[in-house]
Amino acid sequence: MSQTQSLAVKTRAGLGKGACRKLRADDMVPGVYYDAKGVNVPVMVEHLPLQKLYSKIASSHVFDLQIEGETKPALVWKVEHHPTKPRITHVDFYGVDLTKEIQVRVPVEVVGKSKGQVKGGQLEIHREFIEVLCLPLVIPDKIVLDITNVDINESILIADVVLPEGVKAVYDNNYAVIGVLASAAEAAGEGA
């Protein structure tokens, strides 16, 4: 991202369900800013600027959060949506220290058509996100997996995923991110 986005929020005094309902009725979104040092600040933000920012950066980019005139680097940490309307009902911001690594989820994008799919196999995506550890300013937008060389009954494991410099995958077990399985008809034919 070439230019850091910014979002202005205000601190809020009213806490609880009733106060939050009033904010939402006034086209405001209640939220909480969690500082890297453990300080929690209840905030409110206008819905439209928040919606625009979230559609541009989601949860994978640092932006400048302006709280009552003070600018702090932050991530959109958690967003709650209305169950039937396209509205954000609550947002959590996480203040980051730009010099310390953080753990975040990054979406996986699969490109290409595998050898196994060409032969009739089924692509199975096991993980849509990968947990990574990196500095806040080098969080990748997405992790692209080229699957053109994956054959039937083969997988791409997390240890095989090529990540940008300064980004490390977080995992205990070497799990499969994607795999190509034999189709049901092929599997039945082999068993007969």
From Swiss-Prot:
InterPro entries, sorted: Rbsml_bL25/Gln-tRNA_synth_N, Ribosomal_bL25/Gln-tRNA_synth, Ribosomal_bL25_b-dom, Ribosomal_bL25_C, Ribosomal_bL25_long, Ribosomal_L25_dom, Ribosomal_uL5_bac-type
Keywords associated with the record: Ribonucleoprotein, Ribosomal protein, RNA-binding, rRNA-binding
GO cellular component, one term: cytosolic large ribosomal subunit
Entry's Gene Ontology BP terms: translation
Pfam short name (any one): Ribosomal_L25p
Cystine bridges: none
GO molecular-function terms, A-Z: 5S rRNA binding; structural constituent of ribosome
Job description of the protein: This is one of the proteins that binds to the 5S RNA in the ribosome where it forms part of the central protuberance.
Membership in a protein family: Belongs to the bacterial ribosomal protein bL25 family. CTC subfamily.
Assembly notes: Part of the 50S ribosomal subunit; part of the 5S rRNA/L5/L18/L25 subcomplex. Contacts the 5S rRNA. Binds to the 5S rRNA independently of L5 and L18.
Protein name: Large ribosomal subunit protein bL25
Species name: Solidesulfovibrio magneticus (strain ATCC 700980 / DSM 13731 / RS-1) (Desulfovibrio magneticus)
